[in-house]
Amino acid sequence: MNAEEKKGLQRAIEEITEIAKGFGLDFYPMRYEICPAEIIYTFGAYGMPTRFSHWSFGKQFHKMKLHYDLGLSKIYELVINSDPCYAFLLDSNSLIQNKLIVAHVLAHCDFFKNNCRFQNTKRDMVESMAATAERIKHYEQVHGIKEVESFLDAILSIQEHIDPSLVRPKLQWSVDDEEEEIEEAATPYDDLWSLDEKKPKKQVKKSKKPFPPRPEKDILLFIEEHSRELEPWQRDILTMMREEMLYFWPQLETKIMNEGWASYWHQRIIRELDLTSDEAIEFAKLNAGVVQPSKTGINPYYLGLKIFEDIEKRYNNPTEEMKKMGVQPDSGREKMFEVREIESDISFIRNYLTKELVMREDLYLFQKQGRDYKIIDKQWKSVRDQLVSMRVNGGFPYLTVNDGDYMKNNELYIKHWYEGIELDLKYLEKVLPYLFQLWGRSVHIESVLEDKEVMFSYDGKGVHRRYL
């Protein structure tokens, strides 16, 4: 990109920013960087401009860069949720491509700033991840690259299993606190005479405390706090990895909403620009490529856009029933901003994917049968419920620690809350040894396989399967 093109881009950024503000978008200060493909794909693989080194990121970079070199896919931009918000543009983009991208990332930044799921996000995560990378590099120098990399392998295999509720009471309990004395009334009426000085002697009963007292979703935190295997440097790395995952988690919970919101606004903003005929044609092609539906999956840009457009249409022209509920005509845009603020993908789909929209967009459920894919259901509620199910827990299996002292031997017992989708057995058998590495004792995972309850265990020697 030459100097003249950079000046043109700067003018376009200023104009697009003013248009976005005029529409009511509220975003952090923006910082734009123009980067070559090598840099963009490095950021894409690592997830951030500054992050610790790991072989899995290199593998992802090679795959993405190869697809780019072969013309199979292309990343036009990357946007970082921070304050200020950073957007990285590919240096080979045309001016109209960059105009679309600037409008798109402004809407992303508005979403980051205003959606309730992002309210506890650390806005200085770029600097925080840079500090994490330095600390991990230090541990590699002290303990060896292989030792640290092996530990990172274990953490990254279960990194999604955190509790995204950042504000919650801290539970105080310990594996050493196995028994407590419970006072029982000598008679059913003792509590009625509790003020009497001559109370009957209490009976004392010893009872084993559950550990944890209730199922614990945050497996990383549980291991961090209670594993007897971890050294201080390992516990430190585990803490940092959990913090990074907490940063990424809201993006997993709002993927469809976020992309739909950005797609809606880049269309509206670009329409306000004075485009040449060539630019208008190129924009139409680019936009069609971004929001086109897929026959074999869900395009989050497309689905999110269609739901937001449907909200605007229905609330601009409310039915008599909606009017009785207090909905005012021409309130579509206001409702969209409200939805953007308070919903996640699950509630967004459950509350706003209507029967009419499912039928109009011809959404359906399909299944692979032999070599072919067959449509198995077109009922709108089935489609909606399946989409909601796919977004539960960010799309990852819901696991909880149910016992940290299983068999009274400090073994770890994890339960998979089965809801119709079985665990990937190949992945499960690879993850169990990593859990053993982190916990230091035998690890068990309860799940359902072929409609039968089954427990998978790893004792340091091999994976065993037992039907319950």
From Swiss-Prot:
Entry keyword set: Sporulation
Any one Gene Ontology BP term: sporulation resulting in formation of a cellular spore
The UniProt record lists the keyword Iron: no
Keyword Glycoprotein: no
Domain of life: Bacteria
InterPro entries documented for this protein: Spore_V_R, SpoVR-like_C, SpoVR_N
Assigned protein family: To E.coli YcgB.
Chain's role: Appears to be involved in spore cortex formation.
PANTHER family on file: STAGE V SPORULATION PROTEIN R
Protein's recorded name: Stage V sporulation protein R
